[in-house]
């Protein structure tokens, strides 16, 4: 059970709390969902149980199995009234369906109401990649010269962002690397364990290796082989929030829009490769997407604009 959602704090009867605990354990250990995904699923179910309790129904397993479509629609309407968007509602339904399947597997019966409720339609947002020059600038240690922070911290931030743009990593994947994983000293690949514990091999180009080597040379801490590769100013694991704040500061200095985030560098990696006639399935493998359809959304980005940008700066060239 997640530490943030102890069983005794969940709304509902004891049988529901026990079922939720076993369900979340299944998601984490057998389905190998990431901690963030398990947390989101737990939160969705907790909100639904709280909604049922506010409506005057003490949630227990028999009452959940006997749910009517109108009960689910009432929950969705209440969440919409609270300002929750379509994507979050779609995930909430996915969470409820996952829990319902768990109840069915455990022999409690079928929650047939869920099959009668459609997921909200959500228009898929296009990725918002950065122009090549902006992505190169964000991932460049030179752009940080003069900042009022220790040189090793500037080198660290540059190395993290170089991994996002130069290798297409998610920020959680980059910050989850151990010291012994660092692709330096002749190593030019990374083994990444991504969403759903899916493993992929990622090539690491020379500018990224150089950024990592510069950080390691400057870092004042003795990094244990099995410890985090990236550390904060006190030597503990680096928080994603620190990287986000660093990018926000650079955004202002470079005059970039609010869409210039750490994750935008991963979008830029994929879109810029595709614009250079990169193979879609190869890009899918590099990004760690389970479905090709997820990668195909990058084909809708204006490739003509990107090709023009590539004439000014090529991301696979010697610059980062």
UniProtKB/Swiss-Prot annotation:
Sections of the chain in a coiled coil: none
PROSITE patterns on file: CB, TYR_RECOMBINASE
Family matches, as Pfam families: Phage_int_SAM_1 (PF02899), Phage_integrase (PF00589)
Disulfide bridge partners, by residue number: none
Keywords annotated in UniProt: Cell cycle, Cell division, Chromosome partition, Cytoplasm, DNA integration, DNA recombination, DNA-binding
A molecular function GO annotation: tyrosine-based site-specific recombinase activity
Entries under InterPro entries matching the protein: CB, DNA_brk_join_enz, Integrase-like_cat_sf, Integrase_catalytic, Integrase_recombinase_N, Integrase_SAM-like_N, Tyrosine_recombinase_XerC/XerD, Tyrosine_recombinase_XerCD
Cellular location(s): Cytoplasm
Segments forming domain Tyr recombinase: 125-311
GO biological process: cell division; chromosome segregation; DNA transposition
Residues of the active site: 170, 195, 263, 266, 289, 298 (o-(3'-phospho-dna)-tyrosine intermediate)
GO cellular component: cytoplasm
Gene3D superfamilies xref list: 1.10.150.130, Intergrase catalytic core
Domain of life: Bacteria
Entries under PANTHER family matching the protein: PHAGE INTEGRASE-RELATED (PTHR30349), TYROSINE RECOMBINASE XERD (PTHR30349:SF90)
Family as reported in the entry's similarity comment: Belongs to the 'phage' integrase family. XerC subfamily.
Assembly and oligomerization: Forms a cyclic heterotetrameric complex composed of two molecules of XerC and two molecules of XerD.
HAMAP family: Recomb_XerC_XerD (MF_01808)
Main function: Site-specific tyrosine recombinase, which acts by catalyzing the cutting and rejoining of the recombining DNA molecules. The XerC-XerD complex is essential to convert dimers of the bacterial chromosome into monomers to permit their segregation at cell division. It also contributes to the segregational stability of plasmids.
Protein name per its UniProtKB record: Tyrosine recombinase XerC
Organism for this UniProt entry: Methylobacterium sp. (strain 4-46)
Gene name of the encoded protein: xerC
